[in-house]
From Swiss-Prot:
Function statement: Part of the Tol-Pal system, which plays a role in outer membrane invagination during cell division and is important for maintaining outer membrane integrity.
UniProt record similarity statement: Belongs to the TolB family.
Protein name: Tol-Pal system protein TolB
A Gene Ontology BP annotation from the UniProt entry: protein import
Main subcellular location of this protein, as a coarse class: periplasm
PANTHER family for the chain: PROTEIN TOLB (PTHR36842:SF1), PROTEIN TOLB HOMOLOG (PTHR36842)
Phylogenetic lineage: Bacteria, Pseudomonadati, Pseudomonadota, Gammaproteobacteria, Thiotrichales
Protein location: Periplasm
One Pfam family of this chain: TolB_N
GO cellular component terms listed in the entry, alphabetical order: periplasmic space
Length: 432
């Protein structure tokens, strides 16, 4: 392993609005089975010609990204109803659409906005969702649109939507011939990006706390790897692991009381657990091999990690109460970088099969499916509802992020205008 010694340290904490552009999204594939939904442009009552945000466009893109739904082309809408009484149900039936979204945006006297949504089941001829938000600032209009998407998704699937969530990732840019790393947080669609830390040295492996208030990540700011705990409000930042050798791969326990991490302070790279209150360590693996990238099962009773103890990287599970260990990946010679679905049923991993792709193992029936066709895929992370997987990939020699829906063939690619994106981590649910 090549040893790199850094002699120049430079890092900046950032809490203001991002000076960088948001991520841009490209829908690479679409699902033939996506259910059409009519999204009627919202009625606008305000001083300007158009509302500050196109709510239906945001909702439409959210639903398209799920792989389950698609918006009817606006030009094909037979009418633009504002109330339930305006709807000609026979007319919409001829279009083959079962659901319709309509609403209103009203500019309030103090410069904030009131947003109303009505979601209609055209078959039952009734409104199934009615919601109003008042006192909404311009900066929060996109968040309200994501909340609408969540409500619609849950109404139609029975599964809570995960559009009103955030993701953390690392960007790498060349600034005056030198690499600049930035740890950033953005909405699930790549908008509203905010830099958390900017450094001239690498930043890796961000991991969200279960309450969404902190990030643990790996920094090299003191010339060697160390694990940092940082609050998103900028009020606290602590170095919690700076042992000799490797300090890496932090992962929060489901209750937020512990952190799994990889350390080599005792020789080989092994998985440890740190009590976040006492900072005491428990060594979980003892092997000459490299044991790393541990993630917690949702019940907190076991961890999944990758190890090359059999000669090639494979995924193992270790139970905390007994120390029992078992191998779970058997398809192919290379499986690494595990991620666990929120219900504990699926393990996503990087699988080598003529390239590195994201695959999913069903722990219930042992079905193994390769989900992606992109290049040099790594770092899978599930959405909070388990319906989508965010991961890093390479396109044209540039690092980008991508999201694949678990049960369809829809892939979206997220990139920055300049530089690369890597090390994604999908955050927990935000308050409804």
């Amino acid at each position: 392993m090549k040893k790199v010694i850094y002699t120049i340290v430079g890092f900046v904490f950032m809490w203001s609005t991002s000076v960088y552009a948001d991520l841009t999204i490209q829908i690479d594939q679409s699902s033939d089975n996506a259910v059409p939904i009519a999204l009627v442009p919202f009625e606008w009552k305000g001083a300007q010609l158009h509302p500050p945000q196109n709510i239906t466009s945001i909702v439409g893109n959210d639903l398209l990204r799920s792989g389950k739904f698609k918006a009817v082309d606006e030009a094909k809408l037979p009418s633009r109803p504002k109330t339930l009484d305006d709807i000609d149900f026979y007319q919409w039936k001829q279009l083959g659409v079962d659901n319709l979204l309509m609403g209103r945006i009203t500019e309030e006297a103090n410069g904030t906005y009131q947003i109303e949504m009505r979601f209609v089941d055209l078959l039952r001829k009734e409104q199934v969702i009615g919601k109003r938000w008042s006192g909404i600032s311009k900066s929060l209009l996109r968040q309200v649109a994501h909340k609408m998407s969540d409500l619609i998704y849950e109404e139609l699937t029975g599964i809570r939507g995960a559009f009103n969530t955030r993701m953390a990732y690392v960007t790498v840019r060349n600034v005056k011939g030198k690499k600049q790393y930035s740890l950033e947080v953005a909405d699930s669609d790549g908008y509203n990006s905010q830099p958390i830390l900017r450094s001239s040295l690498p930043i890796m492996s961000p991991s969200w706390s279960p309450d969404g208030q902190h990030l643990a990540y790996v920094s090299f700011e003191n010339g060697r790897s160390q694990i940092v705990l940082q609050s998103l409000d900028g009020k606290s930042r602590q170095i919690i692991a700076k042992f000799k050798g490797i300090n890496g791969a932090p992962a929060w326990s489901p209750d937020g009381k512990k952190l799994a991490l990889t350390l080599s302070k005792d020789g080989s790279a092994d998985v440890y657990i740190m009590d976040m209150k006492t900072r005491k360590l428990r060594r979980l693996t003892r092997n000459w091999a490299i044991e790393t990238e541990a993630v917690w099962a949702p019940n907190g009773h076991s961890l999944f990690f990758n190890s090359d103890r059999r000669g090639q990287p494979q995924i193992f599970q270790v139970f905390l109460d007994t120390g029992e260990m078992r191998r779970i990946s058997y398809v192919g010679r290379y499986n690494a970088n595990p991620a666990i679905s929120p219900d504990g049923r699926y393990v996503a991993m990087v699988h080598a099969n003529g390239g590195f792709h994201i695959a999913v193992l069903d722990l219930y029936n042992e079905d193994f499916n390769i989900l992606t066709k992109t290049y040099l895929d790594e770092s899978p992370t599930f959405s909070p509802n388990g319906e989508m997987i965010l991961y890093a990939m390479n396109q044209g020699g540039q690092g980008k992020l991508a999201v694949v829906s678990v049960n369809s063939n829809v892939t979206q690619i997220l990139s920055v205008q300049e530089g690369e994106v890597r090390s994604p981590s999908w955050g927990p649910y935000l308050p409804r």
